């Protein structure tokens, strides 16, 4: 039995244009959609297995990327946004009506990823943003109900479509976190 990873990757990766200038994210409401403008392309796009990220119906993973926070603007129906969990490091702003997470923001200025907002590229109304580059927090899908004996197949499928599976973030992002921590300790 094949597990649905995520609709945007189940049939393989669709490569980005390499020149994506940004676009508009729209929630899943039929009308009065929350719309969020994004300037520029995304970075560190990945499939995420954590239990905090928003996933479309039936998906095992979310697909999430980052953009500089100054490149994120709520365009329409911002009054429908609410923070999902005020105690979480990433303040996920979701539509109150449909539950779609529109962007996640870190307010702690000492956090290694402060200044980057987390978004779900599949919500772009436009095509061409960066394709997912890796899979993170893969083992965490067990916490959301995946059977442990399915994990080898999931990892194999991720590799087959071109996503290296990690049980944390990618090495480049882990290095960025460690560098931030080392600099903070040296200060």
Swiss-Prot record:
Keyword hit for Cell membrane: no
First-level EC class: lyase
UniProt name for this protein: Glutathione-dependent formaldehyde-activating enzyme
Provenance organism: Bradyrhizobium diazoefficiens (strain JCM 10833 / BCRC 13528 / IAM 13628 / NBRC 14792 / USDA 110)
Cofactor dependency: Zn(2+)
Listed pathway(s): One-carbon metabolism; formaldehyde degradation; formate from formaldehyde (glutathione route): step 1/3
E.C. number(s) listed in UniProt: 4.4.1.22
Xref: SUPFAM superfamilies: Mss4-like
Cofactor binding, note field: Binds 2 Zn(2+) ions per subunit.
Catalytic activity: S-(hydroxymethyl)glutathione = glutathione + formaldehyde
């Amino acid at each position: 039995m094949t597990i649905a990873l995520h609709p945007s990757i189940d049939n393989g990766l669709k490569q980005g244009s390499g020149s994506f200038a940004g676009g508009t994210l729209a929630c899943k409401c039929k009308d009065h959609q929350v719309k969020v403008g994004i300037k520029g392309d995304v970075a560190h796009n990945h499939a995420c297995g954590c239990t905090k990220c928003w996933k479309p119906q039936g998906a095992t993973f979310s697909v999430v990327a980052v953009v500089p926070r100054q490149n994120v603007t709520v365009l329409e129906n911002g009054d429908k946004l609410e923070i999902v969990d005020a105690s979480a490091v990433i303040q996920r702003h979701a539509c109150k009506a449909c539950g779609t997470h529109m962007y996640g923001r870190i307010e702690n200025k000492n956090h290694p990823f402060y200044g980057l907002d987390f978004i779900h590229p599949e919500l772009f109304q436009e095509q061409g943003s960066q394709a997912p580059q890796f899979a993170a927090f893969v083992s965490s899908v067990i916490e959301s109900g995946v059977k442990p004996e399915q994990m080898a197949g999931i990892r194999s499928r991720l590799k087959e479509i071109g996503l290296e599976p990690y049980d944390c973030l990618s090495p480049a992002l882990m290095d960025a976190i460690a560098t931030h921590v080392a600099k903070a300790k040296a200060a």
